[in-house]
Amino acid sequence: MELVFLGTGAGVPSRGRNVTSIALSMLNERNTIWLFDCGEATQHQIMRSQIKLSKLEKIFITHMHGDHIFGLPGLLSSRSFQGGDSNLTIYGPAGIAEYVETSLRLSGTRLTYKINFEEIEPGLIFEDEMFLVTADDLDHGVRSFGYRIVEKDKQGALNAEKLKADGVEAGPVFQKLKNGEIVTLADGRVIDGKNYIGEPQKGKIISIFGDTKETANELELALNADILVHEATFEGDKAKMAGEYMHSTTLQAANLAKTANVKKLILTHISSRYDRDASKELLIEAKTIFENTEIAYDLAVFPIGE
């Protein structure tokens, strides 16, 4: 898995940063892409990346501000033109279905696939055999969600060396043993696959927040995450301004990462007042509190768990 930052700016696009969108690439895990927010020109950013719209399975919208949703109609239309025909699910606050459907209807856009809308409330919003996703309210004036994506633990690897030491040669029997089955070998021995499977591989946790000021709900969403993606619209000494505008500072994000025991913090949603050099200063001050911090730039790619 990896995170691809398609847009990392706040409010309006700038020369250095487009508005918000983040792709969670899970090509190795489930051959799909999940998208978190879709600001204006997100599809242009996708053309500059390795992402293919045909792989897009789900879109998660954090809130209904324009810099997080204005890219949806064009992206959905282009997906159709490019041959995307698999169903797509869009999760988000109340109003997301009306916004998308109205935009497509008034523009006369017909899609080659079905969109399923899930207008969410806090709690579990998706689960299958591989992942579960929960959402909770943040604090941004309008309803804004944070998402917690949990990869379920994976079965441990089959210990081929141990099998070889016990005189079991590689072959079709390995698949049955990997499934934990009890197998009778050609020589009459009966062995239990569970005795040859290693410890389960712990799944990853990714927390991706929408716009927010400091709020108690953040802690549970971020707790023990492998990666926390948090807005940092303002520098640390502008906490009062950040609160008034319902946003966060670098230091507030770093303090949350430290308290929540996350492994890596990635700062995004950077105000256009900070050019690339000033953004480096934002990173430096966040690192004074939480060392394993990165600041995202457009088209930056972060492998999960590295």
UniProtKB/Swiss-Prot annotation:
Q: What is its EC number?
A: 3.1.26.11
| Membrane found in the keyword field | no
Residues of the active site are D67 (proton acceptor)
Gene Ontology MF: a single term = zinc ion binding
> One Pfam family for this entry, by name?
Lactamase_B_2
Q: What is catalysed by this protein? A: Endonucleolytic cleavage of RNA, removing extra 3' nucleotides from tRNA precursor, generating 3' termini of tRNAs. A 3'-hydroxy group is left at the tRNA terminus and a 5'-phosphoryl group is left at the trailer molecule
Cofactor (UniProt): Zn(2+)
Give binding positions for Zn(2+) 2.
Answer: D67, H68, D211, H269
The entry's protein name is Ribonuclease Z
Q: Identify the species of origin.
A: Listeria monocytogenes serotype 4b (strain CLIP80459)
Instruction: Recite the lineage of the species.
Output: Bacteria, Bacillati, Bacillota, Bacilli, Bacillales
